[in-house]
Amino acid sequence: MVNAILRTYIPDDWSVITLGNYAQIFRGGSPRPIQAFLTTSDQGINWIKIGDVGEEDKFIKSTEEKIVPEGVSRSRMVFRGDLILSNSMSYGRPYIMNIEGCIHDGWLVIQKYDRVFDRNYLYYALSSSLTMKQYVAMAAGSSVQNLNKEKVSKVVLPCPGISEQKSIAEVLSDIDTLIIDLKKLIRKKKDIRQGTMQILVTGKKRLDGFSGDWVKINLAKNSRLKARIGWQGLTTAEYLDEGYSYLITGTDFKDGHINWSGCHYVDYDRYAQDPNIQVSNGDLLLTKDGTIGKVAYISDLDRPATLNSGVFAVKPITNAYTAHFMFYVLESSVFKQFLQQLSAGSTINHLYQKDLVKFDLYVPPTTEEQEAITGILFDMDLEIYKLEEKLSKYQKIKQGMMEELLTGKVRLV
């Protein structure tokens, strides 16, 4: 069926092949108990685990652990140029081997494919949405979402000539390089931002033109802390896909902002029920359930919004602090250390208003200094945001290129 569908839109001079007919596919194996086979010897065999690869990795170049040679017969040996697939975690994600080693039963290996496939082209073909859709279709009706040799063997792939495969893989590799380099730059900018924030919100570095001792304040005494109270709790049926007002929950927090596209909605009556939790631009939000202590500063609200029960609205009621400055304090180690002291080494699943009564901190003595600090950090956030937008654009371009190049809608030769 998939073969017939593919034939309707790929070029006439391409083939459509079933992977298992042109490659050898095997499942890994695990010597047990594994601890008895691990070794630190240089003579050990690389023991490949999902933890040995990062999010952007295409190649497996090293491993944290090795097994003794006697374990090879109870496992599966893989070699340079082989492709391995995770059959459960990172479902179906391919990697190219740059080393030799052994794989456990959480991996599948694809070998002896080079009669018809270029290595890098096969990597991208297996990474494509076309392949992922086939995996999903094969798993339909099953509660266990994992791969096996039989499923991967049935995967159908478009197959141009080797020279065209190499050209396609080269173009996709170039866009991958751009994406990886941009991710590295974003991580670097975030690290710099984190370090700058830490020294500015603690007063370890003062900005030019400001002096005077910082002032000790208590967050609760200088704030209005509000959340949805128990009797106002929402039922699942009240979580709407469209409605009058955004409903902000703890899962909507992302990188100091609210992911509006992921929010549910509530009707007008639920929004109007409690003005204390109606959200406006300039508000500071703090999660108090689940992953506690996540914080968001609201600056891009485009319609009414209200809170679910797991979120505090924190609003200044004195001139002791600005909400934007406090946002950065709550993002810093100052607040993280406070939460650690609250937990006393154990996990806390709820942040109470009475807990925040205990939170004392030092702030600049003037609003002007707080705003100057905020301005520097906001500019850094804006730069990171623009880079992340650029990254998202590159990722969308890559997906479009994969769709067009791997099906022959766009030809390179």
Give the label of every model feature segment.
Residues 404-413:
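Acidic, low-complexity, intrinsically disordered peripheral segments
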Residues 1-30, 154, 162, 208-230, ...:
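Non-catalytic DNA-recognition/assembly elements of restriction-modification systems
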